[in-house]
Every structure is written in C-alpha cells, then in structure tokens.
Amino acid sequence: MFDFSVITGVSGSTQRRAIAKAITLLESTRGDQRAQADELLTALLPHTGKSFRLGISGVPGVGKSTFIEVLGLHLIKQGHRVAVLTIDPSSTVSGGSILGDKTRMDLLSVNENAYIRPSPSSGTLGGVAEKTREAMLVCEAAGYDVVMVETVGVGQSETAVANMTDMFVLMQLPNAGDDLQAIKKGVMELADLVVINKADIDAIAAQRAQLQITSAMQLLGMFAGYVKANWHPKAIQISALKGDGVEAFWAEVQDFKARQTANGKFAERRQQQSLSWMWERVDAGLKHAQQLHG
C-alpha cells in the first residue's frame, strides 16, 4: 500500500520522491499495479482541487519552457508553490522520448518550491499524456497551488489540455501568419489568452500580430456566439527571455480567474472536467477488461 500521507505532508526531498513514485505508479500499465494506483488516487482526491491549473500550448521553438521558468520563479517570489508537467513527443519508431524540457528550466528545477515532471506522450493525441490529469491531482494534493501543463507543441491538435485546465494559454511568434492562418488553427478558438513571445526581436511584427490575432479571436467569438463569462479572449506581448510582460501576464490570469469565479463559470468548468475525466476512466477500464478477456 502506498503511503499517501507523505505526499500530503511536509514539503521537502522526501515529499518530492513520493510525488515522483506516485506519478510513476499512476502512469504504469502493469495490471498488478492498477488496483494500487486506484487506491492511491481515491486517497488523494479529498486533498485536490485547490490549485489553479494553467495549460500552455504553442509550436516548438515558441519559448514555452523559457516562459514557464520565468513565470514560475516570479510566482515563487510571491509565495506560490509551482508544479510543472511537461509532455514530450514519443517516437513513432522506437516509442522513446527525450524528456528534455526539464533541462531548459535550470533555475526552476532546483528551486525547493517547484516540482517539474516530464512525461512522454506515448502516442496520446491532444498534446498531453494519458495520465496528465492524474499527475496534476498528485501535485495538488502535495500542496502546489499553481499547476502548469506544457503540451507537446505539435500545432493544431493541442486541444485536450483545454479540457483539464482552468485557463488555456496559446503562445505565438511574431510573423507566424496572418489572421486567416490564426483562424485555421482549431486550437485558437479554445484559447483564453494568446501570448506573443519574443516581441523584443521585432516590435512592429509583434504589434501587427497582436492586432491580427485579436481580430481573429473576435471573429471566432462572433461566429461561435459565445462570451466566456464576461471575458473577451485577447492577445498580449511578452519577452520571456528578458522577463518583460510576465507581471502583466499574471495580472491577466488573475483578472480571468476573478471574472470566472464571480460568474460561476470557474466551478462549472471544473465540473465539466470531472465529468470528462470520469468517462475517460470508464473508457479506459472497458478497454482494459476487453484486453484481459479477449
């Protein structure tokens, strides 16, 4: 039996090792560990739900890891504990994954108030791993009040993370395409906020991208006929490498959370996520039973 009290106990190296073991257990595909993983999850669930879940997506090279490290260090200075779940693509040939995102977060990875866990996608679509949601719950039970999920970063299919986080952020580059290109990306209509990174490299292009993306999101909203709980998705500029715009970004996040909470949409979104997770587990259980009994 896994001692879950270590996870919910005092923070430190012992807790970090317990978190790693718990996530490994939940990710295991071994049949003899399935019951133990379910028991662990059941024990941890009462201690979850108190964090803010932030999904971050964007194409490779957009600067997700750099941005997450700068943001994470900024939040830790404000008294937060930050967990980062990074998803690396798995090879379709060997099935392996480099799991190198953690190496791009040198300062954050050694901070005692941060926990970074790289996981392979293992062929799971939507930009996340099969057990990302469960890993997020483990981090919440351990007392991390901000949990960030960095997706694989393959482009238009990065949608699953939007269904398991409180806010979905899409990162873009200046000169990444006009507003029609933005509309083509199905992930755009799910974004609560678009961040244009590396704005310092070409200020004119960044300004143009901000205007084009904002107009594209307004167009998407008009045709979809939705208003996100008194929140109008927008685009902002940052430079993660220089640390410019990080405070403004977090202010937008806080504003979004306040509006969602006031209108009851925050709780509604969590309920929808729980329902989605339940059906995912039912589906996984049926597939497992079919494999066992042919």
Enumerate the predicted regions with their spans.
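Nucleotide-state-sensitive switch-loop elements of NTP-binding domains
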Residues: 2-54, 62, 71-157, 164-170, ...
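P-loop (Walker A) phosphate-binding loop of NTP-binding proteins
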Residues: 59
